[in-house]
A protein has these predicted regions:
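Conserved C-terminal helix/tail region of periplasmic/extracytoplasmic solute-binding proteins
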Residues: 301-324
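Secondary-structure end/capping motifs
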Residues: 232-308
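Pocket-lining segment of extracytoplasmic ligand-binding domains
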Residues: 98-99, 172-173, 177-265
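N-terminal secretory signal peptides that target proteins for export/translocation
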Residues: 1-14
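Short, glycine-/small- and polar/acidic-enriched structural segments
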Residues: 36-166, 171-174, 190-196, 209-211, ...
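Bacterial N-terminal signal peptides
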Residues: 12, 17-29
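Sec/Tat signal peptide C-region and signal peptidase I cleavage site
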Residues: 29-35
Length: 324
């Protein structure tokens, strides 16, 4: 027996066709949006404004509105972060004065975007409390631990110069902070040049005495850095990042105890100790002015003169221009 198939009226097919078409358009637009979405890769360290910015999540909405997503990568210190920036693995990050100079000597990639005010009390030369070393001049012939190419490298250079010594008069021992602290505590080195919060943690440990901090020797600026190509192509995104950092700075300046509690788990240092470090920190992101640019050039020229970097570098030529 044959079964007769009833014809479906064209009028009843139209709604289904419209739904299918709408779904197709939605999927196409979604795929197109994801294809157009760009990524800002931000390098951060365990301590500082950028890790606060990451934790608060306030940057993501600002950049999403411009078609960007944010990818965060943690680094143990400034030098490897700058290496990643030179290699094109990071678009934005922060470091002290010395790491960008070593990076510039290696490649003409880096751009200075902004800086925080000077914080000379945030780094120091430490000796054991029982040490016979009473002045920087007493470091002659001693082993001094430091992170090569970091901010404290310049502090050591300036401090021994002021004491009438040269690098040849001491034995630098290049170690990352954790290894340097271990060497310091077991007496394998005579002094340790270090920055906050490791400086504050060593003080709190009870066996460290401050031989000299950066006061009168170095400014100890914190710089925000990018690549020249990223600056040229992503000006509005950089402006959004700087604005987000400024917001976090404004909050952190008046809430150091709250900041300490927020950072403590990631840094692995108790909040009360972090509070000491944070009170030595400065806040207020701003563009590089002529004075800061000249001081950074002075640091670069010093390292070149000591043959610690292989060539001269041009700081002013790497500074982001207003409106770019």
């Amino acid at each position: 027996m044959l079964t007769r198939t009833r014809a479906v009226p064209a009028s009843s097919l139209l709604p289904r066709l419209w739904l299918a078409l709408a779904a197709l358009i939605f999927v196409s637009l979604t795929l197109a949006a994801h294809a157009q979405e760009r990524t800002v890769r931000i390098g951060y360290q365990k301590y500082g404004t950028l890790v606060l910015l990451k934790g608060r999540g306030s940057l993501e909405p600002k950049l999403k509105a411009q078609g960007y997503r944010v990818q965060w990568s943690e680094f143990p210190s400034g030098p490897p972060l700058m290496e990643a920036l030179n290699a094109g693995a990071v678009d934005f990050g922060s470091a002290g004065e010395t790491p960008p100079i070593f990076a510039q000597a290696a490649s003409d990639v880096l751009a200075y975007v902004a800086h925080e005010p000077a914080a000379p009390k945030g780094e120091a030369i430490l000796v054991p409390k029982s040490s016979a070393v009473q002045s920087v001049a007493d470091l002659r012939g001693k082993k001094v631990a430091l992170n090569k190419g970091s901010n404290v490298h310049y502090l050591l250079v300036r401090a021994i110069e002021a004491a009438g010594l040269t690098l040849a008069d001491i034995t630098p021992v290049y170690l990352a902070p954790a290894d340097a602290r271990a060497a310091f505590e077991r007496g394998a080195v005579d002094a340790w040049v270090i920055w906050d919060p490791y400086f504050a943690a060593a003080e709190a440990g009870g066996n460290a005495r401050v031989l000299a901090d950066g006061t009168g020797l170095v400014p100890n600026h914190q710089f925000y850095l990018s690549s020249k190509s990223f600056v040229a192509e992503n000006g509005p995104a950089l402006d959004a990042i700087v604005a987000a950092v400024a917001e976090v700075d404004a909050w952190a300046k008046d809430n150091t105890d709250a900041v300490a509690k927020e950072l403590s788990p990631s840094v692995g240092i108790p909040a009360p100790i972090l509070s000491i470090a944070l009170k030595r920190q400065t806040y207020g992101i701003r563009p590089l002015d002529e004075a800061v640019t000249k001081e950074q050039q002075r640091i670069a020229d010093t390292f070149h003169g000591l043959k610690l970097v292989p060539k001269t570098v041009d700081i002013a030529g790497a500074v982001r221009k207003p409106g770019s």
